Amino acid sequence: MSSFVLRPARVEDIPVLGSIERAADERFRATGHTSFLDGETIPLDVAQRAVEAGRITVAEVDGEVVGWLLVTRLGAELCLGQVSVLPSHGRLGIGTALLRDSITRARAAGERTLVLNTQSDVAWNMPWYARHGFVVVPPEEWSPEMRAVTEAQREHGIDWNLRIHMRLTLA
């Protein structure tokens, strides 16, 4: 396999983002977290706006997009919205490169924090983010926006008994 390159997503990349997300989410089948397997992916209009705003970075191998990362805002904080890598290209450092790139760009932009929500019991979720400096945000420290995300995800069927918010302090 050739090496990968990271670049800002382009409009022509949008159609493959959902299929990459669905393929990556298949890993959850073995964990019992089947709510991620409902087939729902980033809506096309959301992807369009994110691409136009420069908020999606893709990883490309031999001209094929094999992974992507989305950053959004959660109130005053930058939020890691999605990281997806095709399983056929997993464990090659692509996800780590996407994450490190987002951290570097956030710092360069003067962001103070980067937050996310993830599963606490899945090896490629909470422990992976912790290795990159993210720490669990205790519920009593959740922002109103974190509480709103939690409630919206619960309403969508996501079990928050094993889900957490995490934060990386950048500045």
Region annotations inferred by a language model:
Residues 1-15, 164, 169-171:
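Conserved N-terminal entry element of GNAT/NAT acetyltransferase domains
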Residues 22-48:
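Conserved GNAT-fold acetyl-CoA-binding loop/helix
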Residues 42-58, 79, 159-161:
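A short helix-loop-beta-strand connector motif used in the catalytic cores of GNAT acetyltransferases and
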Residues 58, 64-72, 77-84:
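Conserved beta-strand in the GNAT
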Residues 85, 91-104, 131:
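Conserved acetyl-CoA-binding loop-helix of GNAT-fold acetyltransferases
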Residues 106-119:
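Conserved GNAT acetyl-CoA-binding A-motif
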Residues 116-125, 142-147:
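Conserved beta-strand-loop-alpha-helix junction that forms the acyl-donor binding cleft
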Residues 130-138:
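Conserved acetyl-CoA-binding loop of GNAT-fold acetyltransferases
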